[in-house]
């Protein structure tokens, strides 16, 4: 297990440990989580992204709904613990179906399990990729004058996204944290929604003539594509 995954797991396990300690002390367990409202969204100048502010809401076992939320969170953390220990991964969809074996803790619909993963991201300050949760959709492709280093199952490899790829380009992996930008000669990045337009630009040598990095979004961009573009 990598160092960041160990830190992630340690942070995750603090949640059920806190619930247990509260119950041990005879208290009704609860957890705090950032409130998901427009009023609680702030722009982080350093990272240049929108983040949640300091406003908190409480998930408590005082209500039946709150008790179910804490129970499901404990089951999900147990599942993520096993997944990290075994170096396995799963999709959001798979997590929903796996919960069918959790008895009263199972999710009634996938949006419930999706929101819980989002809750864990907010509480722990780790991304779902660190939990080994991956999206269903494929990443987009990149063509252009940029050299990257990617961590693969067989070690690291360096790829130039013009010289070392075919017309299909370099496919963005699910976890873009495994990519390091080494150098580039690009003047700008252009994101293209449709495959036809992207292919036309490649055929006409647009990336070489204008030193452009062409990113094919494949319609609505996947999470990994959005994260890569932000970098």
Description of each model-found segment:
Residues 1-231:
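Nucleic-acid enzyme cleavage-core boundary/entry regions
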């Amino acid at each position: 297990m990598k160092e960041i995954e160990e830190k992630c797991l340690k942070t995750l396990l603090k949640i059920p440990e806190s619930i247990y300690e509260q119950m041990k002390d005879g208290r009704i367990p609860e957890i705090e989580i950032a409130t998901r409202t427009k009023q609680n969204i702030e722009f982080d100048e350093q990272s240049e992204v929108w983040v949640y502010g300091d406003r908190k809401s409480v998930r408590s076992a005082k209500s039946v709904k709150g008790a179910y939320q804490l129970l499901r969170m404990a089951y999900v953390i147990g599942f993520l613990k096993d997944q990290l220990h075994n170096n396995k991964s799963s999709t959001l969809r798979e997590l929903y179906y796996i919960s069918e074996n959790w008895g009263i803790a199972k999710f009634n619909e996938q949006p419930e399990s999706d929101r819980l993963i989002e809750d864990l991201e907010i509480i722990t300050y780790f991304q779902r990729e660190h939990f080994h949760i991956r999206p269903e959709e494929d990443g987009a492709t990149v063509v252009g004058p940029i050299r990257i280093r990617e961590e693969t199952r067989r070690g690291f490899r360096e790829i130039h996204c013009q010289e070392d790829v075919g017309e299909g380009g370099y496919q963005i992996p699910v976890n873009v944290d495994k990519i390091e930008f080494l150098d580039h000669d690009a003047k700008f990045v252009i994101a293209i929604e449709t495959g036809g337009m992207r292919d036309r630009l490649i055929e006409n040598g647009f990336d070489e003539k204008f030193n452009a990095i062409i990113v094919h979004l494949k319609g609505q961009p996947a999470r990994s594509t959005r994260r890569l573009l932000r970098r």
